[in-house]
Swiss-Prot record:
GO cellular component terms, semicolon-separated: plasma membrane
InterPro entries: Aldolase_TIM, GatZ/KbaZ-like, GatZ_KbaZ_carbometab, TagBP_ald_GatZ
Name of this protein: D-tagatose-1,6-bisphosphate aldolase subunit GatZ
One of the GO biological process terms: galactitol metabolic process
Family, similarity comment: Belongs to the GatZ/KbaZ family. GatZ subfamily.
Pathway noted in the entry: Carbohydrate metabolism; D-tagatose 6-phosphate degradation; D-glyceraldehyde 3-phosphate and glycerone phosphate from D-tagatose 6-phosphate: step 2/2
Domain of life according to the entry: Bacteria
Keywords linked to the UniProt accession: Galactitol metabolism
Subunit structure: Forms a complex with GatY.
Gene3D superfamilies in UniProt: Aldolase class I, putative tagatose 6-phosphate kinase domain like
Disulphide bridges, residue numbers: none
């Protein structure tokens, strides 16, 4: 990370896409995408996804590391080009507890991530706990972030400290996505970004963390990009010019969250304007979902009814029987809720792919289609971009390859934005 940031600060319009997903096919797609490019790949886990108690994936930080390393080994991707990050590390998961106990757990969370070899750490203590006022005083946020940083510094080995970097601040929706519709986005004011930096510097120095301040590479801000279930707010560079200008006077860059579904030109403009770390998550699993739905349509054409995976029906059955991950997010009307379940940009379906019934039906879908020849016309009908790539000779038409390439469509847009010499 330090090399990428220093190159950006030296004047290169270079950035990095942060892949925020625990889905094995998404991680495989990212590693295969940059297998021969020489680029670093940044993969991040969030605190609610992966923590010392297992998170919703059931993985602790060391488990997630081994999970990613296992995929890297299968792909042949060298570990030295992998950067592991932890996102929203702080009391996010324990906001309903008193601040003291939430912070104790947050300290252990940080220690677990750093000990497991995660080198990009987002120190996020912005959320109010059960006995806190709302919103929190910025100095309280900074002091708590400094305590988390202290835990990281005391845990890291000398070798780990060579690579250890911190991200501070937050200007983002609740980790996991917006719960309601958005109409407009407040772009961070440069004076608020400056205050975030100043309060964190003071809090770090008060704990003797002067050396750690040199590891702070980025501030999270809101440049004016967002999405909800049905709409996208696109980047408007002119609205963020003052913010973009301010960061030039610091040794840092910005980190932008929720950059999913922006245009490739928007990614290039964001990187140009010093939002050099672009986070993406739901757009990747949205592309995965599109690929699986497309393959299900092909299966309906090619496989007899009694042999089909019924993947679409299984998804509906599971999500309707177990609505915990989508009910409070989606529209209450039945017909609208079904549209959201299938096609929402926030892609709450991503939480259901590990479900045993859904996983088995996806495996059967892929096995069924591996046993037949996929007609080019059918691929053109349901996956037209992949059909073009087949015609160009850069893709072979297996179900697995089609899924991987569909996910990589998203990564291609980020590569355009993060790499100035890509046309």
């Amino acid at each position: 990370m330090k090399e990428i940031i220093s190159r950006h600060k030296a004047g290169e319009q270079i950035g990095i896409c942060s892949v925020c997903s625990a889905h094995p096919l998404v991680i495989e797609s990212a590693l295969r995408f940059d297998l021969n490019s020489g680029n670093k790949v940044l993969i991040e886990a969030t605190s609610n996804q992966v923590n010392q108690f297992g998170g919703y994936t059931g993985m602790k930080p060391a488990d997630f590391r081994d999970f990613v390393y296992g995929i890297a080994q299968e792909v042949g991707f060298p570990r030295e080009r992998l950067i592991l990050g932890g996102d929203h590390l702080g009391p996010n998961c324990w906001q309903n507890e008193p601040a003291d106990t939430a912070m104790e757990k947050s300290v252990e969370l940080i220690k677990a991530y750093v000990a497991a070899g995660f080198s990009k750490i987002h120190l996020d203590a912005s959320m109010s706990c059960a006995d806190d006022p709302t919103p929190l005083d910025p100095m309280v946020v900074a002091k708590r972030a400094a305590l988390l940083c202290q835990a990281a510094e005391t845990t890291a080995t000398d070798e780990q400290k060579r690579h250890l970097t911190y991200v501070i601040g937050t200007e983002v929706p609740v980790p996991g996505g917006e719960a309601s519709a958005i109409n407009a986005v407040h772009v961070t004011r440069e004076q608020d970004a400056a205050r975030t930096l100043q309060t964190h510097q003071a809090a770090f120095r008060a704990l003797g963390l002067d050396e750690a301040l040199n590891r702070v590479i980025a501030i999270v801000v809101q440049p004016g990009v967002e999405f909800d279930h049905t709409q996208i707010i696109h980047y408007q560079p002119q609205a963020a010019q003052a913010l973009s200008a301010w960061i030039k006077e610091t040794p840092m860059v910005y980190e932008a969250h929720s950059t999913d579904y922006q245009t490739r030109q928007a990614y290039r403009a964001l990187v140009r304007d010093h939002y050099a770390i672009l986070k993406v998550g739901p757009a990747l699993t949205f592309a995965l979902r599109e690929a699986i739905f497309a393959l299900a349509q092909m299966e309906n054409e090619l496989v007899s009814p009694e042999q089909r995976s019924r993947v679409m029906e299984v998804i509906d059955e599971v999500m309707l029987n177990e609505p915990g991950y989508w009910k409070k997010y989606y529209r209450p009307t039945w017909s609208q809720a079904m549209i959201d379940i299938h096609f929402s940009l926030s892609d709450r379906i991503r939480y259901y792919w590990p479900h045993p019934r859904i996983r088995q039906s996806v495996e059967k879908l892929i096995a069924n289609l591996n046993n037949v020849t996929l007609p080019l016309g059918l691929i053109s009908q349901f996956m037209p971009v992949q059909f073009e790539r087949l015609s160009e000779g850069v893709l072979t038409p297996t179900p697995h390859n089609l899924i991987i390439d569909k996910i990589q469509d998203v990564l291609r847009a980020y590569r355009f934005g993060c790499t100035p010499d890509v046309a």
